[in-house]
């Protein structure tokens, strides 16, 4: 990072998490892992499971937030209400509560599949140029399934189901917190699959302080797709196309 003043490791984690308000758990985990690698500290399996559960819970909540946004764009009031309500219920839920919410989450997917007007508005919208490269996350995974806004919707729904399954087999979700690293020095890096795709962080640690870092986010790669997606499109379709990328303004490099 440019214009970055050396900061204590714990404060750096808070800085990174608060700088990314749409995916704070993902970026907290990213910072913890990079610092722990720099310090030569390894997590125990229970901590890893708890962190993974928290990451998947954030993925579910994030995708529900995206679905609510789709509802707002298209004027589907029921979708805005249902997805927003579920998002709030998921955000801080423990494992047993998430299991309880599974039928409601699956029912939402079923209803979306039975909404012909939704398919009509999303199918063929936001098709990526064939030369698109370095795609990440749901945008990349949907590229082989039609690569349009409709495919991205179904990719995110599939990820909600997959995340639920992972949580059922993992530990109780816990916010990542830094292991005791002492005042060590070293370099570390980490990669986390955030709700919007892979984020990578490399950093330099000196006497327990982060001296410098470099952060690479999925959205910083996807922002370049916008111009092609809106070219020659009516405003409504252009907004849906861009919305289907789920860009976070905080995660787009200046």
Located regions from the model:
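Active-site bordering "gate/hinge" segments
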Residues: 1-254
